[in-house]
Amino acid sequence: MPPVGEHLLLDLYGVSPALLRDADLLESTLREAADALGATVLHAHLHRFGMFGASAPEALGGGVTGVLLLAESHLSIHTWPEHGFAAIDAFMCGAGATLAARAIFEHALAPSRVDVRVAQRGGLPG
């Protein structure tokens, strides 16, 4: 059986903490990546985390987790502003070109370093 999908994993380092706290920017970037992949967005959910022990206005200064549920699978981002780090997944069923999403995230978040891994999922003999 051929692979059932392609899974892109991006680790972005050296990202501005302000960008990693901006849920609106992160959602629009996820949607732009979905569009670049030719994916159909079924649902979006983003959650802003508060900073432990902080009081307003810093209370929402923590990271963001966002997921786009796609007809083809999913896109997700998890951010750690205190470390300048974002972990991004793009999983597309079928023959994917998930690397098309990489440029979208790099342009929006301007990391100083990017680690990229691509895995073919499934593909068991049979």
Q: Which residue stretches match the model-derived regions?
A:
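Polybasic/polar functional segments that serve as interface/processing modules
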Residues: 1-126
